Amino acid sequence: MRNPQPMGARNPRVAKTELTPDNYRNLVEAERKNERHINLYSTGYFWIAFEQSAFMLSKLFPKCAVLRANIPGYPFPVVMTMIKDNELRSYTREHIVKKPTPSHCILLTNAYDRSDFALWHRRQLNA
């Protein structure tokens, strides 16, 4: 049976507690230590990844949308990637996904080369 409701929208109260302007800085800061997980945060019909997670998501989904953003209170531009809820649903049918909350899911990946991330990040900021 097809579920038309996005995965992260099952409990809208939870979704709003994870991805808020107050939390953006914490989420971006946590990415600095991230080497093997893609942290995705629901916005309803889309899932967003920041910085290192965004880099790894772009490798997994080469056609994902890439965005640059300035986050209030964070001194540097941030690179984000975004995929549609239905793309994530398709992926999760064949892969193990952790879901700490309905609005946050974690995909396990291989460790990446930090110099590859730095080059990708620079290119995205200068695009």
Labelled PLM ranges:
Residues R2-A127:
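Basic, polar low-complexity surface loops/patches
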